Regions:
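Pocket-lining segment of extracytoplasmic ligand-binding domains
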Residues: 96-98, 106-107, 136, 172-266, ...
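Bilobed "Venus flytrap"/periplasmic-binding protein-like clamshell domains
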Residues: 26-58, 126-193, 288, 304-308, ...
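Extracytoplasmic
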Residues: 24, 66, 76-79, 86, ...
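N-terminal (or domain-start) structured segment
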Residues: 22-95
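An extracytoplasmic/periplasmic, membrane-proximal ligand-sensing/linker region
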Residues: 186, 193-194, 203-217, 221, ...
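Acidic, polar ligand-binding/catalytic clefts
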Residues: 89-124, 204-208
Length: 328
């Protein structure tokens, strides 16, 4: 059984629309690794969709406009965009930089050009973090040379960002002693088991996977303020400097400066206005509840959600809702 079909079945069991399965429209939201915040974004959206439809229609009333939502774990940003382009997913969570590159066709070797990509809203900020193993003697980018580094699985946003970072510093994987392609759910365990010395991760703060390594085995996040990083931020509108505050994790003894992107929810121009409108309505009319689903969502602001990190055009279904509510 595939991941997507398994997720659909599990959601159907708990959905208030089980009795109207024949009239419900199924849709899926591509997320990321099960320990990452993207997985939480997708499942929080599904919760809000279920909540608003249950309130509007009730378990017994039924409706010919019901939706059934699943949010399976996936390979991440570029995978999600590719699956949306192929029509296998209706929505996906993606880093703002990969949204930009997909829509504008500026990195065709990393993500296929897709001018049918449409933005829905942005979510939380995502600092790119390099987490180093206790005792590794890694203190900055230069000290990663010769170390065992996980650069992320192919198709993930963290892999893409790590490759951009390597390119900006004029190095390739040969700069490191060895590289691995572990997923986000595998890397913290590997670090604590001393199988790797460091890993890169683009993720909202705080994150359970990062805490597994920092709080569990004394790993720490390093500063990323090299001249190439400063140039990346100045040259690209989808990047910004980010601070991980002191006290975020047990080993966060001081503020750490790095750079990052925004997490964004994207879809295709081929997805119906009605479906996109319904999803946006479910999230924005339950935003207080949505913000409680993960600490990274605590500071979400509706006015910023409809513009920050969005380089693809907004989907007409989203625009309709935002205009109705006076947000644009």
């Amino acid at each position: 059984m595939s991941t997507v079909s398994a997720a659909l079945i599990m959601f159907a069991v708990s959905s208030p629309f089980t009795s109207i399965a024949k009239s419900a429209e199924f849709f899926s939201i591509g997320t990321g690794g099960p320990t990452g915040v993207y997985f939480q974004v997708g499942n929080a959206i599904c919760k809000m969709v279920s909540k608003i439809q249950s309130a509007e229609h009730g378990r017994k009333k039924g409706t010919d406009k019901a939706y059934r939502c699943s949010a399976p774990s996936t390979g991440g940003s570029t995978y999600n965009i590719g699956q949306i382009m192929q029509g296998e997913l209706q929505f996906g969570v993606a880093q703002s930089d990969w949204q930009y590159h997909a829509y504008n066709g500026t990195k065709p070797d990393k993500v296929k050009p897709f001018d049918g990509l449409r933005a829905v809203f942005s979510a939380h900020p995502e600092p790119f973090q390099i987490i180093a193993r206790k005792g590794s003697r890694i203190k900055d980018w230069n000290s990663l040379k010769g170390k065992k580094v996980n650069i992320g699985n192919p198709g993930s946003g963290q892999r893409g960002t790590f490759e951009v970072l390597m390119e900006s510093h004029g190095v390739d994987t040969g700069y490191f002693g060895s590289t691995s392609e572990l997923t986000s759910s595998e890397q913290s365990g590997a670090l604590c088991d001393k199988k790797i010395d460091a890993f890169g991760y683009t993720v909202g703060v705080p994150n359970a996977g990062v805490a597994q390594s920092t709080d569990g085995c004394g790993a720490y996040i390093i500063d990323l303020q090299t001249d190439p990083v400063k140039k990346l931020v100045s040259d690209n509108p989808f990047y910004a400097f980010a601070t991980i505050p002191k006290g975020t994790y047990k080993t966060s003894k001081k503020d750490v400066t790095t750079f990052g992107v925004m997490a964004s929810v994207v879809t295709s121009a081929a997805v119906s206005d009605e479906l996109v409108y319904s999803v946006v309505k479910a999230v924005f009319e339950n935003l207080d509840d949505f913000k409680k689903q993960h600490p990274a969502f605590a500071n979400l602001d509706p006015k910023k959600m409809i513009k920050d990190g969005l380089s693809a055009p907004l989907h007409p279904g989203a625009v309709k809702y935002y205009k109705e509510k006076g947000l644009m």
